[in-house]
Amino acid sequence: MGPVLDWSANFAHSLHRCAVRDLSHIGWWLVALSLAAAEPGGGGYRAEIQKWREGYEADLKKDNGWLTLAGLFWLKEGNNTFGTSAENDIVLPKGSAPGQAGAFLFHDGKTRLRLKDGVRALVNGDPLRTKSPAEIPLNPDTTGKPDRITLGRLSMIVIQRSTRFGIRLWDNNSAVRRDFPGSQWFPIHEMFRVTAQFTSYAQPKMIPILNVLGDTEQNPSPGFAAFKLEGKTCRLEPLLEGDHLFFILKDLTSGKETYAAGRFLYTTMPKDGKLILDFNKAENPPCAFTPFATCPLPPKQNHLPVAVTAGDRKPAHGTASH
């Protein structure tokens, strides 16, 4: 989570424009997935899954992780003032910043930052003072390298979703982070580690992906995974995630034992037409923890006809729901 896209090679720009998901956690996940996983059939496999889960939760709880997300503010044309005063367009958490800290100047899809005199901030880790220069252009997340503003314990970036631009806010003093009870997991069952047959498309197939904002974007899928689970024939279409695959899926537990909007699963690339799908690593999307994420929803073809009682359960009381 914590993610959170950041998309790979030739698909990077098209998927950034789609901006269907958030990938702040992806660095940790790619490292974890690249480690040699223990083969199932003993304590080594269970230990590997447990270690993966510990890393997943640590990533959720880190500074500027998903549990610290504290706001999403859509920009209007012109000045968008920010600070802790209620008079601002973007109201920051009480006690976190000056009452009038500055403004985001938004015009024709471009965003610039202007600070009030005397306000100290960092942009990409470098100190920024007013009048040096007075206005700073900001790259949105769809460029793959968003400019990050740090204001005390807060940080902000510009995000783009379809035709909308907004300010994403993190607060490292977030009560959600402080009170997080930990993830709820199903017991580890090796039957949910399956070998799938992967069929590559001659050319990437564009599939529509709806997100929680109601936006639908076309995204390329490299192929599909076919497998049997509990006697049922199943099929999933992934998106590309760097040199890995990203599955957005639902199953018969969704809305009951697991998060209603579905779960995510990441895998390495197929080898010799085979792909390992380990549903013990199925995880909740960021929207399970915060209303300020912009997660994608599973396409209809990724609704499994079985109950996958493995991986992340429904979040504990007090977390977000969609």
Residue ranges of each PLM-predicted region?
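Tryptophan (W) side chains
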Residues: 7, 28-29
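Hydrophobic h-region of N-terminal signal peptides that target proteins for export
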Residues: 29-39
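N-terminal pre-domain segments of enzymes
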Residues: 38-73
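Surface-exposed beta-loop interaction hotspot
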Residues: 154-216
